Amino acid sequence: MIPAAPDCAPVEQRRLLSPEDRQRLAVPPSPPEASPRPAYADRLQPSSLGWVSRRSWCVWIEPDPQPDRFSGLWRQAVDTALARWGRELTLQPVERADDAHIRLWRRRPPRQDGRASLGRALLSLQMVRRGGADRPAPLVDVLLDPGQRLQGLQATALHELGHGFGLWGHSDRPDDVMTAVPGPRPPSDLSPRDRETLRWLLGRPSLFRPEPPPPTP
């Protein structure tokens, strides 16, 4: 385990944002954009407090108390998906679920609007205290059904992690990991459009990023 970075220091307190927090942190409307958004960035939606965007994320993976072949495949798919996103972002493993921004759970998501799904990302905006300082932070629970074949599970993990990392929207092309309708061979890696959209997002102002955004290309 890599030693925890300062931004992944133990969480001392965590709570949902209160109405007073939301009023204080409210983001003013953005001015009109001077140029069209790249790739499928025009399909992304901000949260109620603006873009959920970070360059570094603390990640926790649910351990399996009784490892077997199927749980090994689940972990292999998750590790591969994280490695793909880790080429674009800094992903720091943490040992406690409460210290994470992203938590990956080995479970089938509950039905939503009567429909079943193989994966889901659930976003919660919270106030988190680390080192005595309170900061707004995202918490994303990623639920991944372990009853999938390796290829499908990896594609599901790539897609739901994309939501977790701030890509709250879907591409209209089947070769992007954030596609709304995957083709017969789901993507196994980020496409150039996925990377371009993520880099655009990382250039937007965000309450949830401890570091300044990089220069916009």
What spans do the regions from the language model cover?
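Disordered inhibitory propeptide/activation segment of secreted metzincin zinc metalloprotease zymogens
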Residues: M1-F70, G132, L207
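Metalloprotease/metallohydrolase-associated module, dominated by Zn2+-dependent proteases
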Residues: M1-Q13, R120-G152, W168-P217
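Generic detector of well-ordered alpha-helical segments enriched in charged/polar residues
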Residues: A41, D79, R103, T179, ...
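Divalent metal-coordination and catalytic microenvironments
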Residues: V59, W85, H159-G162, M178, ...
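Generic beta-structure capping elements
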Residues: E62-D64, R107, V181
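Short, acidic Gly/Pro/Ser/Thr-rich loop/turn segments
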Residues: Q66, R111, R185
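Short, polar loop/linker segments at the starts of domains and inter-domain junctions
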Residues: D68-Q76, L190-R195
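Metzincin-family zinc-dependent endopeptidase catalytic domain
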Residues: G72-G164, W168-S171
